[in-house]
Amino acid sequence: MIAGSMVALVTPMDAQGRLDWDSLSKLVDFHLQEGTNAIVAVGTTGESATLDVSEHIEVIRRVVAQVAGRIPVIAGTGANSTREAVELTTNAKTAGADACLLVTPYYNKPTQEGLFQHFSHIANAVDIPQILYNVPGRTACDMLPETVARLSTVKNIIGIKEATGNLQRAKDILASVSSDFLVYSGDDATAVELMLLGGKGNISVTANVAPRLMSDLCAAAMRGDAETARAIHEKLMPLNNTLFIESNPIPVKWALHEMGKMPAGIRLPLTWLSEACHEPLRQALRQSGVLV
């Protein structure tokens, strides 16, 4: 079972927006050393929208090779074209990914039946574990619990990243699926409570900069130690809030640069973190113990 702290890994770039393979390698090592339970490559935080297909598959291939089976690698392969999502998912399987994360189609706003057919088609076309991803704040598409319940019985669909931040939504999904269907948080601010409800982990932006703390939080929450989990959550709250002071992954890439983990690089239309946000994020890193 894929569970625990799953980092939504950034894709390091230089100042010209070229992929920085050396920094990527060092970030993977950082997570292996700090207790991260799985790596999600080229998802939203990994800037999948601005990577071309060859770059997309090369990031996955390199992460898989470096991890070498020590923890699961989940590849972001969602698209708003079903045909393209099948292609990306096939490529990820060929590259050795353990599972794929598929965001709901964005911009074209399919119906609930369209969502069911989209994800069912991909699951039937590519034999690899697949995780649904619902983040309506980014996609303008909200997959309802009834649709999730229908999809939960489709072969190869093993779980969902629920990123609405709505705990009632998580409760509704948990109540409508079997116990072996994995419900993950995709919202750092509410992740601890979702896991205490029965969720199996957190696909986390905050884990990029605080992997050990997020791993400890997830472990405590999943064993039912609410006191410990909530105490760690309180420590991380400044980061959970400030890492979204501008659009993700702008702040987290700046934070990793501030930590000396990667160059100052991001691709248009995203831009580097505005100067007014530097000190608030620096203070959050200090308050959470990431910077001294």
UniProtKB/Swiss-Prot annotation:
Residues noted as binding pyruvate in the record, renumbered to the chain: 45, 203
Entry GO terms, CC: cytosol
Catalysed reactions, semicolon-separated: L-aspartate 4-semialdehyde + pyruvate = (2S,4S)-4-hydroxy-2,3,4,5-tetrahydrodipicolinate + H2O + H(+)
The protein's name in its UniProt record: 4-hydroxy-tetrahydrodipicolinate synthase
GO terms of biological process kind: diaminopimelate biosynthetic process; lysine biosynthetic process via diaminopimelate
EC number(s) stated in the UniProt entry for this protein: 4.3.3.7
Keyword Cytoplasm attributed: yes
Pathway where it operates: Amino-acid biosynthesis; L-lysine biosynthesis via DAP pathway; (S)-tetrahydrodipicolinate from L-aspartate: step 3/4
Subunit structure, interactors included: Homodimer.
Protein's cellular compartments: Cytoplasm
Stored PANTHER family: 4-HYDROXY-2-OXOGLUTARATE ALDOLASE, MITOCHONDRIAL, DIHYDRODIPICOLINATE SYNTHASE
Organism: Pseudomonas savastanoi pv. phaseolicola (strain 1448A / Race 6)
Lineage: superkingdom: Bacteria
Residue(s) at site: Part of a proton relay during catalysis: 44, 107
Keywords: Amino-acid biosynthesis, Cytoplasm, Diaminopimelate biosynthesis, Lyase, Lysine biosynthesis, Schiff base
GO MF assignments: 4-hydroxy-tetrahydrodipicolinate synthase activity
Active-site residue list: 133 (proton donor/acceptor), 161 (schiff-base intermediate with substrate)
Enzymatic class: lyase
Function: Catalyzes the condensation of (S)-aspartate-beta-semialdehyde [(S)-ASA] and pyruvate to 4-hydroxy-tetrahydrodipicolinate (HTPA).
One Pfam match: DHDPS
Protein family according to the UniProt entry: Belongs to the DapA family.
